[in-house]
């Protein structure tokens, strides 16, 4: 139905805005599904997630992946994070466009001095905060949204330090109206993004890749289990999967729970790698080769 990107400096009132928006949306209609995606919902700490550029990039990848899995035409997803880089907001906009849903940005425009003060007060209360050096770094790299950019539009602006943030705030009400208004041929003030052929093809290709990887890795697991059962519990050193495919080399017997755990980890790693590199293999043989190489390394180590 919609994707809402919360944007602002650290400690600018974003989480309060996300909570108020979600509550106002749920109050507007009883059959609406609203979900907030943030670092804490994924068990990620603030300082650990922003301590350097590598982990920050990984954080954005994890959040983007979770948004990609969650967006649909039946729910409203609220991304409560810094979303401080315009290129990243563009990526989120592309996800909304590929899903054919509404999109908007809710910007918490809070002066840096107030953000710093709120961060200090949280430290005094023992609440989760940003270390001072991390806070200063994030502030210096913030890219303010611009409503002239399609990925920053429509833009709803809140001023938490001046007006506070409440469920009844006029800007919250305006955003709720935009997100829930019924759209017909006469509607002009609400824009539902339309997927392009390119985005539809990309999502289909990714789905096919994940299907092939899931299928191929399960077949490898089945082959190992069958070979070990035929060996009556004795170690099976080598398992052939057929011509032009690598041989599975086992130094010991491997139980089904361990095999399942290795398979889950492999699929997770392949998905994370595809966020910054090439997509997962689209054919079964390539997926099989990758998984067998991974198993041979992990089991022999």
Swiss-Prot record:
The keyword Zinc-finger belongs to this UniProt entry's keyword annotation: no
Main location: cytoplasm
GO (cellular component) term, any one: nucleus
Protein residues bound to ATP: 8-15
Region Calmodulin-binding, annotated ranges: 262-275
Gene3D superfamilies membership: P-loop containing nucleotide triphosphate hydrolases (3.40.50.300)
Molecular function GO labels: ATP binding; calmodulin binding
Highest taxon listed in the record's lineage: Eukaryota
One record GO biological process: tRNA wobble uridine modification
Annotated keywords: ATP-binding, Cytoplasm, Nucleotide-binding, Nucleus, Transcription, Transcription regulation, tRNA processing
Short name of one Pfam family: KTI12
Keyword Transcription: yes
Purpose of the protein: Elongator complex-associated factor that is not a structural subunit but rather transiently contacts the complex. Regulates both meristem activity and organ growth; acts as a positive regulator of adaxial leaf patterning. Required for an early step in synthesis of 5-carbamoylmethyl (ncm5) groups present on uridines (ncm5U) at the wobble position in tRNA.
Record's subunit section: Interacts with the elongator complex. Binds to calmodulin in a calcium-dependent manner.
Family that this chain belongs to: Belongs to the KTI12 family.
Alphabetized PANTHER family for the sequence: PTHR12435
Protein name as catalogued: Protein KTI12 homolog
Native source organism of the sequence: Oryza sativa subsp. japonica (Rice)
Gene: KTI12
């Amino acid at each position: 139905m919609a994707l809402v990107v919360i944007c602002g400096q650290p400690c600018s009132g974003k989480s309060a805005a996300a909570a108020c928006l979600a509550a106002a949306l749920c109050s507007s209609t009883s059959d609406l599904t609203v979900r907030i995606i943030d670092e804490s919902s994924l068990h990620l700490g603030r300082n650990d997630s922003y301590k350097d550029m590598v982990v920050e990039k990984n954080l954005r990848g994890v959040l983007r992946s979770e948004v990609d899995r969650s967006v649909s035409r039946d729910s409203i997803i609220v991304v409560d994070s810094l979303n401080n880089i315009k290129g990243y907001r563009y990526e989120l906009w592309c996800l909304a466009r590929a899903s054919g849903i509404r999109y908007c940005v809710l910007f918490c425009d809070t002066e840096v001095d107030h953000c710093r003060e709120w961060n200090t007060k949280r430290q005094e209360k023992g609440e989760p905060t940003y270390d001072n050096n991390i806070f200063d770094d994030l502030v210096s790299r913030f890219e303010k949204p611009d409503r002239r950019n399609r990925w920053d539009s429509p833009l709803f602006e809140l001023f938490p330090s001046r007006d506070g943030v409440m469920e009844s705030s006029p800007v919250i009400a305006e955003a709720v109206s935009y997100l829930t208004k019924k759209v017909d041929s006469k509607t002009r003030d609400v824009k539902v993004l339309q997927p392009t052929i390119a985005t539809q093809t990309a999502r289909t290709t990714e789905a096919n890749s994940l299907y092939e990887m899931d299928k191929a890795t399960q077949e490898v697991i089945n082959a190992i289990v069958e070979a070990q059962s035929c060996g009556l519990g004795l170690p099976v050193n080598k398992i052939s999967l057929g011509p032009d495919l690598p041989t599975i080399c086992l130094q010991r017997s491997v139980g089904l729970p361990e095999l399942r755990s290795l398979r889950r980890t492999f699929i997770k790693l392949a998905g994370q790698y595809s966020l910054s590199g090439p997509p997962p293999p689209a054919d079964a043989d390539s997926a099989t080769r990758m998984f067998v190489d991974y198993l041979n390394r992990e089991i022999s180590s």
